[in-house]
Amino acid sequence: MSWDQFVIFAIVALLCWGIGAVAAWRGKRQWMVYTATLAGLAVFFAFILGMWISLERPPMRTMGETRLWYSFFMGIAGLLTYIRWQYRWILSFSALLATVFVIINLMKPEIHDQSLMPALQSIWFIPHVTVYMFSYSVLGCAFIIALTGLFRHKEEYLHTADNLVYAGIAFLSIGMLLGSLWAKEAWGNYWSWDPKETWAVITWAGYLLYVHLRLFRKTGRKTLYVLLIMSFLTLQMCWYGVNYLPAAQQSVHLYNRNN
């Protein structure tokens, strides 16, 4: 499986997700919603698995490879959110968010090889990346809910956001813990306040602040939605935005400095 074949798998997966989203929006033929969405996920994962086999390493090293996982998990998170709360529009927006990162990958192809630097040859590598990407996708759904709630002014969306943030921050915390164990093994320190690590803490603190504000239940709905949106933006900064900062050019977390 080569990167050149990604466009074929991506188009098929996006078409399936689009069919599922339209069926959900119309509120009819639930079997079509699940069949189309799951088919898209299967096609997308088939490409990831094919890359894994052909590269003889987990496709998690480059930024483009992590975007693959995010798009895949975004589809899963959107489907789970739809199953739980039955919002007809959630699959459309989750598919749209996944599509954004798929398009970035199509517009910015990478060179993929079998090399894997020593720091990435760790038992913590795969669980850290997958848990983090899944947490990002769940929090991506919370971002979608926050945007929708901000414009529709519905209280129920805030309760949905609560549940998504609780799950998302739980996985985010586990991902940070796995990352610290990995850092200890690879570089000798659990935490070094590297630029990426600093932004990880800022992101985590933003969602933790939301959780605490909800516990007191004295903060306005609009403020909470804005906080979720800002927290998601810091998450994007932590994921890839920090790579463009001058201070991050010597970061130990830049595994592929050409991407």
How would you label these PLM feature ranges?
Residues 1-259:
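Polytopic transmembrane helical bundles with strong interfacial aromatic enrichment
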